[in-house]
UniProtKB/Swiss-Prot annotation:
Broad class of enzyme this protein falls into: hydrolase
Keyword Protease tagged: yes
Cited InterPro entries: Ntn_hydrolases_N (IPR029055), Peptidase_T2 (IPR000246)
Family, as annotated: Belongs to the Ntn-hydrolase family.
Cellular component terms per the entry's GO annotation: lysosome
PTM: Cleaved into an alpha and beta chain by autocatalysis; this activates the enzyme. The N-terminal residue of the beta subunit is responsible for the nucleophile hydrolase activity.
Signal peptide: 1-23
One GO process term, biological-process aspect: proteolysis
Pfam families documented for this protein: Asparaginase_2
Protein name according to UniProt: Putative N(4)-(beta-N-acetylglucosaminyl)-L-asparaginase GD10667
Length: 393
């Protein structure tokens, strides 16, 4: 009898505990998007309700490329939501910069390589599907960002490069034409007249510091690598490493990010920078937000700063801290690089960080500036060791 009584009491105890647990689960508040992003709710509620607040829709891009931003904003405002409109906004905005040859570092007629040729890199990323279309080393085709879109929409690939990318563009209806202009030719001739200085070679002979080559490898003891690297360092600056990176978000939180550039001036032919690399030049995820980068692509692409920024926001960091963290990872290894990063969460909050420049300008269009929906923002940069200046808006 006592054995049966004890068993019955034990069953009742277990049932009571189970009921209590279920009640707690059913009555616990679900994490909201705000608490997820502030890191207060454990697992991020990445599929929270949509917002139609004052921050959206929005377009944001690197540098003071105003015309590109204005066009993208106009396209986005005309939309009723949907993936196509954010894509249209980014592609047409970047295309505008290509046509205007923004700072001679986007589009045709700028940044000639060692042979005097201009080649183009571009990328489009869809934050809903995580699909990417990109081109690198594109030759004789002016519309790099539009070709990247065709890679996204008409192939199962992520990136096409070089002459094969140009052949693909021809098949898609794009015409071949020279990307060299009198200005870019003069730029190249002046460079060659000055013994091809500066350049991107190291550990070769003849000495790349005083000669145009052709070069051959020079065996170098490992202990001398840092010395040679410092001696042959190419001075990176805005006028030879600009990229337009653009993010568009509509009121339904659909996100696209895109980039376009003609790369590093006087680059070794075949060089590809960070702009067309997913996670480096740009990254977008509808569940979190997006980021775009600009600067020394050869260094930045090794660290995937745009991906780092998006993942930091996924973990709860605000955009400004996420951008800062993306650059700090680079600074652990490269104290002398130049770069900037913009991060935006899916609700339209944004921040920027920069290093190695006096300041970094970027364009923003959103309802948040009712009297000035399209506006230029700037962030002061600090060139000191392991210091990154940030702006949170």
């Amino acid at each position: 009898m006592r054995t049966h009584l004890r068993a019955s009491l034990w069953v009742l105890c277990l049932a009571s505990m189970a009921f209590s647990i279920l009640a707690a689960v059913n009555t616990s508040p679900k994490p909201t998007l705000a608490s997820a992003f502030s890191g207060k709710a454990g697992t991020p509620a990445v599929k929270a309700n949509k917002t139609t607040g004052e921050l959206l829709p929005m377009v944001i891009n690197t540098w003071n490329f105003t015309a590109a931003n204005v066009l993208a904003w106009r396209i986005l405002k005309q939309s009723k939501g949907g993936l196509r409109q954010t894509r249209n906004a980014v592609v047409e905005g970047c295309s505008k910069c290509e046509k205007l040859q923004c700072d001679r570092t986007v589009g045709y007629g700028g940044s000639p390589d060692e042979l005097g040729e201009t080649t183009l890199d571009a990328m489009v990323m869809d934050g809903a599907t995580m699909d990417v279309g990109a081109v690198a080393g594109l030759r004789r085709i002016k519309d790099a960002i539009k070709v990247a879109r065709h890679v996204l929409e008409h192939t199962q690939h992520t990136m096409l490069v070089g002459d094969a990318a140009s052949a693909f563009a021809n098949a898609m209806g794009f015409e071949s034409e020279s990307l060299v202009t009198p200005e870019s030719k003069d730029m190249w001739l002046q460079w060659t007249a000055e013994n091809c200085q500066p350049n991107f070679w190291k550990n070769v002979h003849p000495d790349p510091k005083v000669s145009c080559g052709p070069y051959k490898p020079r065996p170098t003891p490992l202990t001398r690598w840092k010395e040679d690297r410092a001696r042959n360092e190419y001075e990176i600056g805005r006028k030879n490493h600009d990229t337009i990176g653009m993010i568009a978000i509509d009121v339904e939180n659909n996100i696209h990010a895109g980039t376009s550039t003609n790369g590093a001036r006087h680059k070794i032919p075949g060089r590809v920078g960070d702009s067309p690399i997913p996670g480096a030049g740009a990254y977008a995820d509808n569940e979190v937000g997006a980021a775009v980068a600009t600067g020394d692509g050869d260094v930045m692409m090794r660290f995937l700063p745009s991906l780092l920024a998006v993942e930091a926001m996924r973990a709860g960091k605000p955009p400004a801290e996420a951008a800062q963290g993306g650059l700090r990872r680079i600074l652990k290894h490269h104290k002398d690089f130049m770069g900037a990063l913009i991060a935006v969460d899916r609700l339209g909050n944004y921040g920027a960080a920069c290093y190695g420049l006096e300041e970094f300008p970027f364009m923003v269009s959103s309802p948040a500036g009712a009297d000035r929906p399209t506006r230029l923002e700037t962030v002061k940069c600090i060139a000191g060791q392991d210091k990154v200046n940030i702006v949170a808006l």
